[in-house]
């Protein structure tokens, strides 16, 4: 696949606990989630530098891969295999990510269903991107919406959070069902 198996997004604010939330734990690091930004380039610096075309980049990547494979054969460190895999994924993302992130391809009806402004980061945008990722074979998608742990003004806090998440959450389930993807997708909503 041109996309990672495990993608993490947030609605723009920080994520309590940070990258430890999607780390691989006791599993090999190939199982670590890849954080996507909710707008623009999903991963910073994934584009080729100015003056580097796809052929030059492929040649460079092949050389680095050969050196990494040689080192992997010498030391047997599984982290080297992860590095090789990550480099290949980054190369593939350069072509697949722009199309994935372009929500202007969606119909006005779909954008309205989610309550999504395609130009602004939001929970709705993350849910619509999640649906597009499911269509493209991403197996695990984690969307964080911070701010639920209210210690004062609980009613105001939760009213705002519900307003930001309810429509898009329902739209995601409805849209997956409409596309015939809900029956092969497990949706968990938790806090």
Predicted regions and their residues:
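Ligand-binding pockets and gating/stacking loops
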Residues: 1-191
């Amino acid at each position: 696949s041109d996309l990672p198996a495990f993608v993490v997004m947030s609605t723009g604010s920080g994520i309590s606990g940070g990258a430890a939330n999607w780390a691989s734990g006791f599993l090999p690091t190939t199982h670590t989630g890849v954080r996507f930004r909710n707008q623009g380039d999903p991963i910073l610096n994934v584009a080729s530098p100015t003056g580097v075309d796809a052929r030059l980049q492929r040649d460079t990547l092949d050389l680095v891969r050969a050196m990494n494979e040689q080192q992997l054969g010498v030391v047997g460190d599984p982290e080297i295999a992860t590095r090789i895999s990550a480099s290949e994924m980054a190369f593939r993302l350069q072509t697949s990510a722009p199309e994935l992130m372009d929500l202007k391809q969606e119909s006005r009806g779909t954008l309205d269903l989610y309550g999504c402004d395609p130009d602004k980061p939001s929970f709705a945008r993350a849910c619509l991107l999640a649906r597009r990722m499911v269509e493209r074979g991403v197996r695990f998608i984690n969307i964080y919406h911070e701010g639920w742990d209210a210690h004062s003004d609980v009613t105001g806090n939760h009213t705002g959070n519900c307003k930001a998440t309810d429509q898009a959450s329902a739209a995601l389930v409805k849209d997956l069902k409409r596309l015939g993807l809900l029956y092969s997708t497990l949706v968990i909503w938790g806090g």
